[in-house]
Structure formats: C-alpha cells, structure tokens
Curated annotation (Swiss-Prot):
Family recorded in the similarity comment: Belongs to the TtcA family.
UniProt enzyme class: transferase
Cofactor requirement: Mg(2+); [4Fe-4S] cluster
Subunit: Homodimer.
Name of the protein this chain belongs to: tRNA-cytidine(32) 2-sulfurtransferase
Gene that encodes it: ttcA
Pathway(s) it belongs to: tRNA modification
Binding positions ([4Fe-4S] cluster): C124, C127, C215
Length: 353
C-alpha cells in the first residue's frame, strides 16, 4: 500500500516537473518568435554563470533545438574571473557530461576590480563592464551571431522600477538589442519567464549551482528593495507582475510626456485626434481582474481546454507522465490526434517553436 502511494506521489511530482518545463519552453518559444531572436544558421553563445537562470536557459534552448523551425547551434561560455573559491571544475564536468560544446574563458578581473573599488563598496558595475567586453570579444572569436543572457521577467521589471525610482527614466531591459560594440545581437529568451518557475525547475533538475557572492561584493540594496516590493505584490496581488510586463509592451507615447517620442509641438488646432484624445478625466473601463491574471489562468487550465493549434512534439511523453485524470484530459481534447499522439494545446498565443 505504501509503495503504491509513493508511486502515485512520484508520478504526480514528475507530472508537475513536465508541466513546468512545458510552461518555460512555451514562454521561451513565444519570446523568440515575438522578437525574432533566432534566425536560420545562427550560432548562439549562451553565457553560463553557473546560476539557476543560465542553466535553465541552456537546457530550454537545447530542448527547442529539436523542434525549432530553424537550424541553430549552441556554444556555452563561462568566464572564470579568478574569484576566490570559484569551483572551476563544476561547469566543464557538467557540460561535458551533457555533451554540450563549451568554452571556458579565464580572465583575472577580480583583482582588477578590487584594486579600483574601495573596500565595502559594490563592485558589480565595474565587474559587469569588464565581463561584457570580454564576452563580446569571445563571441567574435567563436563566430557567434547571437549572445544569449539569462535575464528573466523579474529582472526586467526590477530594472524598470530601478530606473523609474532612482534614475527618473522609463527604461527597462530589452529582450533583444545590439551589443555595445555593434557587432552582435544580444537576446534574452527568458524574458517571459518568472523567476519562481526557473527556481523550481533548477531545483527539480538539480543543477550544480555555483554561488554568486564569491567576490564578496556588497549587495545592491536598491535592487533588493525593488525585488522585495515585487515579491510582496506577487503574494498580495497575483497577476500584477504579468500585468506590469504587459504594460511595457503596450506603450502609448502620446499619453506620456516625452517630447522625443511624440511631437507635442506639432499638435495644432484642427489636427487629427491621436490615441483617443483627452480621456484623462474619463472613467476608464478596466477589467475586473488584472490583464496578467489571464497568463496565470492559462497555466492552470486543463491542457485540453486551452485554445491553441500547436502540436507539441513531446506531448505523448507529457501525457503518459500525468496522473490518470490528467491523462484523460490530455487524450480527450477537442483536437484530433496526429500520428497516434495526443494533441496538447499549450497557450493562447503560440509561436512556431
């Protein structure tokens, strides 16, 4: 009896892990499609720090390689900055075991930073600039056309609020941009992924995590404050973070105040009404629930009830790992089976990834 119960528990745990991986894969695929992050023949340099985010990024991209509509190659790159206690063997051993092409760059930026920054001060800014330059150079040497970073949705929102609260700017962290040297495209495929999902996935996969505080730098207190604020909102107002991110994708320049984005001086009597005109004092009709709630609801719907036409290449394995009740939901959806495999819809918007 106990063995049977344990088997059911393990089956449910595996089902939840598979479901989590599908969600991460879906979000990454959607971001890649929305921002045209990857094109045919791209060689993508995945910057691997040894943290949960970069491990997850690498695994999801490797997974997508199997079914992506374009061919692309991956090379994992780690920068050994000679920080005291850095376990230099961890990443090479992991990557070799996974069969991933990799390259380790060794540059003693640790002592450069320590010489320049007074004791007790945050070294992250100078360290990141040095690291960025080295990674750009490495990308050129390896023939990479894309540089993939592991920043996720929470990082992007934190950067937005940091710039708003402390810099007086509406500026975030773009999912895709040109590198400082003008030679490479930098992409953030995890832009739609939540940190809590990445943390759960990394724990389930038991990645060999390398601590991020080996340099001894003081934490960025401003970023900590913003992070605490967003986490508190997540607890008290589910869906708010998703709604905030959606707002970053729905900007109305004529209803802000930046003269560089909109020609306010060019507005004359008789001009056409722009973006609905003056509705500042109107009672706006907002939905009863934040827009971001739909994203959360989509993830909790039974797979058969989601409106999507994408056939997941791994749906048979996904359905088989589910508890019996979930298997029935997966196998009796409104869409027909193809080649004997159940069609499992994954999202309301779906890319060809």
């Amino acid at each position: 009896m106990r063995k049977a119960k344990n088997a059911v528990v393990m089956q449910k745990q595996q089902y939840n892990i598979n479901k989590l991986q599908k969600r991460l894969r879906r979000h990454v695929g959607q971001a890649i499609a929305d921002y045209a992050m990857i094109e045919e023949g791209d060689r993508i340099m995945v910057c691997l720090s040894g943290g949960k985010d970069s491990y997850t990024l690498l695994e999801i991209l490797r997974n997508l390689q199997q079914s992506a509509p374009v061919n692309f190659s991956l090379v994992a790159v780690n920068l050994d900055q000679k920080q005291p206690g850095f376990p230099a063997h961890v990443l090479p051993e992991y990557l070799a075991a996974q069969g991933v092409e990799y390259h380790i760059v060794t540059e003693d930026t640790y002592h450069i930073v320590k010489d320049k920054i007074p004791e007790g001060k945050t070294t992250c800014s100078l360290c990141s600039r040095l690291r960025r330059g080295i990674l750009y150079r490495t990308a050129t040497e390896l023939g990479a056309t894309r540089i993939a970073l592991g920043h996720h949705q929470d990082d992007i929102l934190q950067t937005l609020f940091l710039n708003m609260f402390y810099g007086g700017k509406l500026k975030g962290m773009p999912p895709k941009l040109m590198s400082d040297d003008g030679k490479h495209i930098v992409i953030r495929p995890l832009a739609y992924c939540r940190e809590k999902d990445i943390a759960r996935f990394a724990q389930a996969r038991q990645f060999p995590i390398i601590p991020c505080n080996l340099c001894g730098s003081q934490p960025n207190l401003q970023r900590q404050v913003i992070g605490d604020m967003l986490r508190d909102w997540d607890k008290r107002y589910p869906g708010r973070s998703e709604t905030l991110f959606r707002a970053m994708q729905n900007v109305v320049p004529s209803h802000l105040s930046d003269t560089h984005l909109f020609d306010f001086k060019g507005l004359m009597q008789g001009s056409a009404v722009v973006d609905g005109g003056d509705i500042a004092f109107d009672r706006e009709s907002f939905p009863a629930q934040p827009a971001g709630w739909q994203d959360l609801m989509d993830d909790d719907l039974p797979v058969s009830s989601r409106n999507d036409n994408w056939t997941c290449s791994n749906c048979a394995e996904y359905a088989q790992s589910a508890p019996p009740t979930q298997q029935r939901k997966a196998l009796t959806g409104p869409q027909a089976r193809i080649a004997g495999a159940p069609v499992i819809p994954l999202a309301t918007r779906h890319p060809p990834w």
